[in-house]
Amino acid sequence: MRTAVLLLLALAGAPSLALAQTGYIPYFGKNQIRYDNFQWHTYQTEHFEIYYYPEIEPHLERIAGYAESAYQHVSSELKHDLSMKLPLILFSTASEFWQQNVQPGAAQEGVGAFAEPGRYRIVMPIDEPPDLLYRLIVHELTHQFQFDIIPTGLIRRNMPLWVFEGMSDYMTGYWRPLDIMTVRDAAVSDIVPKMSEMEEYGGFSNPRLIYNLGHAAFEFM
């Protein structure tokens, strides 16, 4: 059912949204400085090819377990399986994550992780509490399912941002208290925009509002 809803939303999508905006807030005017030389290794699971370096090895099986659990959850909810293993690129800390060069400019302060559509890669740090880390994986993994389900080309480009981000937040099954507060505040203040106006971050003083209103819309559906 949710797969059908997603495809219908794609067909009815509002005008253009660049895929480069779906995983993170655009980042301009800064250079990424690399301080570390990471020694990469790979670890295979049923659905992931995990890239890690020695500092991450003590946590590797735990993270792999989170990833596989997240896959089963998203796959079951969307009634869809991916035909390939997903590259999952791990960094030990946020500061090391900011040095990534998978998608130049994608990692910055305030960005917890990102999903890269071209090669279906997920890039993230692991220095979060277990429950938050699991939800982060679910969110980014949902993006990869979206990229796989929604046809490429014109239809995918027309997907509004609230669909991509709202659905990914909805799939985590969790509301942060601050996020639900922003939704209530928008409703009480009568400033909830039309869905056709929730296509990009522009015009919103709080970029999280796009995520939160989209989350609320999927919860309603």
Question: Which stretches of residues belong to each language-model region?
Answer:
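Sec/Tat signal peptide C-region and signal peptidase I cleavage site
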Residues: 14-20
